[in-house]
């Protein structure tokens, strides 16, 4: 909604434009009237809509044509004033003033116009019969107000209607010639209806209507008011109420009725509560609320966010089979501007026979929140999170984690979403590794590996806690890029156990990107089902890891009758959760060994101290 309103008064000389302004401000009819009033600013706290309002007068005798066009360009609404006792001033509305205001606007939005019949004290009766044909000819005319500056009649109402024409315009909502909602308005209201229909039975129950009413207007409807609404709809729309529930047709009819009766602010209140702008598009402020993410921090859905997206899953799982079919997923996206998740979803999260189970669905939301929180905020906005959850914005569904360096200092992370970069030469099996994390086999896939997504996500358990682990495949060619972002919670360096050259490549990556840092690293020997290749001169993988105090290389193979072991994924998640255990301390035996060494060291020190004591005693 606009932050201020600029009203311009136009009309023939002596129709009372200046008198209207001065009567409004002074609350009395002025005895002496200047040729033109200075611009008046009415503070927000004294206007009905709580918006600052600027009122601008015009004098044909004092201002040029260029100055007039400049004022028209700056105005938000124009009041064309005529003298009810002078028919020639009414005719000038059609022939002069409206062409001046909107004559140069062949297409696009036109300035709203309020017709103002002044000096109603000089003529009995009304001029509405003479004005109605003009209103029918020019749809930009919002309304007509008859008033008297001398008797202070309808002065406040005139400026209220002018404000209303700007803040709650009719033109984007309603086509007066067709006497129906404009397509963009009907589409926006249809989306709002679908969001409010929580049980997806194609009707709003009394409970859903009251929730909608409370969300938009701050209070529920009285039981009698609910019945009155449904009675009006039943009387006017066939099928507007079915099974005592308001249907989409009934909902659209009610909003049409509001507009036809001059209560279009009611429809605008609904639209703006659900994030729409004056152009009937979701505003950037609604879709992308402010969310500060400092460097080194990540973003996750919090409990409110997970509860909401799970609620959306259950709402659209119409057959209650625990998965979203392609049709059910399409229904979920019907309130979006377009389907955000494509066929790559099948190779990104765990799926079930081409359908999306709740587990995979939550994984996808988690991945999106981590990789692109702005997109996540927009998706939550499309689903109506702020309205349906009665929150200020969807930013309240997001948690920003503490900085990674603090995790490293404390030796443990509180993050529930962990990032693992998978690096290695081309052809070592990175794509197969990512798909194995989902329980998929590349052998069964129709697409070549290069067409697979670069991210997969699943859950693993670390010390009894569930963690989301994201595997991110780093393209082999991008490793030559000095600006490559290798930041992660754990690095997986993959080499082909049958091709020693690929290990040399991994060792180079480790030395370049990770050797001097604190990121845990795990070397993985892929294709463990193949014979081991002849190692070139130099350190073997096991010796290299031992020298650099890294865990021993883990073996991995996608071939065989059984699914690949998930132990390696658990190991990666554990290393990411406890980043201070960068070296071999991750193995249970090393904890025991370290304890033994400490105990032995203590015993040796005690023996040496006792022996030294005996020598000193004897020397005395």
From Swiss-Prot:
Reactions catalysed according to its record: GTP + H2O = GDP + phosphate + H(+); ATP + H2O = ADP + phosphate + H(+); UTP + H2O = UDP + phosphate + H(+)
Residues engaged in binding Ca(2+) 1: 197, 199, 201, 208
Binding-site residues for Ca(2+) 2, renumbered to this chain: 317, 319, 321, 328
Cross-link (Glycyl lysine isopeptide (Lys-Gly) (interchain with G-Cter in ubiquitin)): 96, 119, 164
Residue numbers binding Mg(2+) 2: 431, 473
Locations listed in the record: Mitochondrion outer membrane
GO MF: calcium ion binding; GTP binding; GTPase activity
Residues reported to bind GTP 1: 16-19, 59, 118-119, 121, 149-150
Keyword hit for Mitochondrion: yes
Predominant cellular place of this UniProt entry's protein: mitochondrion
Broad enzyme group: hydrolase
Start and end residues of each Miro domain: 2-168, 415-578
Ranges per topology, Mitochondrial intermembrane: 618-620
Subunit description: Homodimer. Interacts with the kinesin-binding proteins TRAK1/OIP106 and TRAK2/GRIF1, forming a link between mitochondria and the trafficking apparatus of the microtubules. Interacts with ARMCX3. Found in a complex with KIF5B, OGT, RHOT1 and TRAK1.
The protein's role, per its UniProt record: Atypical mitochondrial nucleoside-triphosphatase (NTPase) involved in mitochondrial trafficking. Probably involved in control of anterograde transport of mitochondria and their subcellular distribution. Can hydrolyze GTP, ATP and UTP.
Protein's name according to its UniProt entry: Mitochondrial Rho GTPase 2
Organism: Mus musculus (Mouse)
Organismal lineage: Eukaryota, Metazoa, Chordata, Craniata, Vertebrata
């Amino acid at each position: 909604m606009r932050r201020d309103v600029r009203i311009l008064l136009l009309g023939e000389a002596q129709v009372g434009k200046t008198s209207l302004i001065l009567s409004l401000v002074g609350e009395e009819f002025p005895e002496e009237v200047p040729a033109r009033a200075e611009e008046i600013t009415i503070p927000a706290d004294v206007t009905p809509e709580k918006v600052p309002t600027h009122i601008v007068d015009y004098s044909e005798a004092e201002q040029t044509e260029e100055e007039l066009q400049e004022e028209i360009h700056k105005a938000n609404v124009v009041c064309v004033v005529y003298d009810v006792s002078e028919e020639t001033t009414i005719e000038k509305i059609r022939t002069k003033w409206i062409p001046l205001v909107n004559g140069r606007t062949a297409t696009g939005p036109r300035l709203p116009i309020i017709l103002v019949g002044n000096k109603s004290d000089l003529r009995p009766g009304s001029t509405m019969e003479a004005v109605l044909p003009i209103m029918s000819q020019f749809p930009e005319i919002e309304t007509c107000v008859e008033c008297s500056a001398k008797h202070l009649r309808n002065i406040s109402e005139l400026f209220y209607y002018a404000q209303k024409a700007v803040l709650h315009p009719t033109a984007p909502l309603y086509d007066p010639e067709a006497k129906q909602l404009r397509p963009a308005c009907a589409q926006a209201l249809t989306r709002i209806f679908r969001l409010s229909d929580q049980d997806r039975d194609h009707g709003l129950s009394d409970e859903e209507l009251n929730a909608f009413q409370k969300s938009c207007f701050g209070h529920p409807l009285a039981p009698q008011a609910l019945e009155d609404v449904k009675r009006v709809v039943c009387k006017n729309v066939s099928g507007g109420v079915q099974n005592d529930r308001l249907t989409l047709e009934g909902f659209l009819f009610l909003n049409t009725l509001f507009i036809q009766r001059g209560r279009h602010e009611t429809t605008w209140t609904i639209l703006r509560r659900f994030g729409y702008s004056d152009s009937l598009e979701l505003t950037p402020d609604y879709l992308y609320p402010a969310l500060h993410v400092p460097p080194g921090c990540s973003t996750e859905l919090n409990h409110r966010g997970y509860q909401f997206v799970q609620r959306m899953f259950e709402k659209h799982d119409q057959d209650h089979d625990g998965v979203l079919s392609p049709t059910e997923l399409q229904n979920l996206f019907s309130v979006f501007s377009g389907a955000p998740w494509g066929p790559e979803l099948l190779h990104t999260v765990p799926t079930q026979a081409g359908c999306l189970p709740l587990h995979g669905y939550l994984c996808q939301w988690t991945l999106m929140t981590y990789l692109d929180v702005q997109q996540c905020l927009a998706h939550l906005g499309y689903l109506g999170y702020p309205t349906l959850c009665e929150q200020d914005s969807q930013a309240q569904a997001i948690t920003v984690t503490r900085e990674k360096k603090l995790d490293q200092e404390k030796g443990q992370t509180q993050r529930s979403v962990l990032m693992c970069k998978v690096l290695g030469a081309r052809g070592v099996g990175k794509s197969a590794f990512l798909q194995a994390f989902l329980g998929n086999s590349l052998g069964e896939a129709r697409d070549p590996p290069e067409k697979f997504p670069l991210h997969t996500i699943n859950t693993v358990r670390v010390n009894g806690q569930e963690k989301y682990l994201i595997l991110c495949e780093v393209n082999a060619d991008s490793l030559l890029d000095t600006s490559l972002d290798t930041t992660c919670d754990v690095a997986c360096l993959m080499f082909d156990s049958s091709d020693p050259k690929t290990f040399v490549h991994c060792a180079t990556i480790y030395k370049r990107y990770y050797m001097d840092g604190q990121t845990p690293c795990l070397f993985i020997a892929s294709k463990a089902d193949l014979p081991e290749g002849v190692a070139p001169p130099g350190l073997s993988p096991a010796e290299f890891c031992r020298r650099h105090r890294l865990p021993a290389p883990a073996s991995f193979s996608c071939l065989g009758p059984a699914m690949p072991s998930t132990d390696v994924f658990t190991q990666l998640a554990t290393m990411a959760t406890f980043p201070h255990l960068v070296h071999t301390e991750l193995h249970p035996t090393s904890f025991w060994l370290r304890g033994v060494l400490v105990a032995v060291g203590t015993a040796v020190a005690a023996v040496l101290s006792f022996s030294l004591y005996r020598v000193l005693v004897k020397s005395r």
